[in-house]
Amino acid sequence: MLCFALLSFTRHPRGESAPAAQMSYTIFSSGKTMAHTQTISRKAPPRAHPAKDPGKVTKTPRMEGRPVWAEVSGSALTHNLHAIRDFVNPADEQRKTPRLVLSIVKGNGYGHGGPQVARILEKAGSDWFGVTSASEGIEVRKAGVQKPILVLTSFWPGEEENLLKHDLTPVVHRCEQLAALNRVASKRSKRDPFSFHLKMDTGMNRLGISPTDVDCFAGQLAKCSHLQLGGVLTHFASSEAFAPSVQGEQTREQEEHFFVALERLRALGVDPGIVHLANSAAIAARPETWADMVRPGVILYGYHPGYDPSEMRAESERKLPLKPVMSLRTRVISLRRVPAGAGVGYGAKFVTERPSVIGVLAAGYGDGVHRSLGGRGCVLVRGKLAPIVGIVSMDVTMIDVTEVPGAEIGEVVTIYGVDGEHTHPANQVARSIGTVTSDLLCAVSARVPRLYVS
């Protein structure tokens, strides 16, 4: 059963015992919602000390459930949405209407929990939501979200009725899709035409009609009396390449192709509706792409995309400060003193160079600890970074806590995120293994409970 909990609690300084807290939470499972109130102890787990003898396994204190969870900060998420909205609607710009924000909640909300994140963002003022598929859109709609939902990767044949039934706005990326959508829309009891958005392929060569096919599209649309074009979009291939480069030039060319095609569409008498092309990177660095609506993805969750160290990127981060939304946590479930020359983990890929204290964490790659972090990454323990050693297992991870005085069994460990005054950001963790932040965030698996805290 996949569980999500909505809760709040009071933080206490490290080392202080906290009273048991009465908290209400909501569990989401298989589309059903069950409200519960439960007393959950916030006291520190029983203390244990490292084994005195090399090789002796220390006793694990009794804990309720498997100690791995992801804390999702509703206040940080709200902060990021408001920061983005203000950023793309500068006070000195003269616009009749403010730019809209379409919050991307695909991929289970970048691992944060799509339906729950969408509810928080709707309350915070998001205008639209973006999902990958009709099934994702239905989950968000069933969570009670009322704002428009755009299905970004279009739809499969046979899904048209679900789109209409759940009031989901599809993206059309092939002219042939219009006829099937129009047939289903003609059966609706509503007299208003069914709205869709058109995707143009301006250089990514993935999805979308070519700008040279605009005339064909306009001709096909004229035959579909039950459809209405509600918006036009494209997607950038390299907008995170801030510094002058081949990739930066590609983005400029994509912008040019898009706006030329848009003017052709208008010349053919077709109102494009809401124009949108700015993704996270373009929001941060390319104001000329903001148009009528922007589509923040990873920046909603607290991170600027890519890892280009250019001055332009640094300036974007200064102008648009974000707060990390998710912290992935676990606990130390075992401590072991090992001598120098001891192999640790599968294949003994890590061999100690000195007498060491090895901690075992109750989380592995089956939870979202990237397997590539073995021997390359670190975790946050008591405000210090402890290296991950050996190969990351499916269910556990080993760390070297020799340099973390007083580390105990039951100790809370932050894989990435925020722990009090200390931060171990996911983008730095991603950079250490040569991947992108979204890869880490989306890897948090279904068996990890999400705790929505304020």
Positions of PLM-derived features:
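A charged N-terminal "starter" segment
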Residues: 4-12, 22-169, 439, 449-454
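Active-site loop/helix belt of alpha/beta enzymes
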Residues: 43, 63-66, 107-124, 142, ...
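Hydrophobic faces of well-ordered beta-strands that scaffold small-molecule active sites
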Residues: 70, 101-105, 129-131, 149-151, ...
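Residue-level signal for inorganic ion chemistry
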Residues: 77, 140, 232, 332, ...
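Flexible, glycine/charged-enriched surface loops at secondary-structure junctions
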Residues: 94-98, 271-274, 423-430
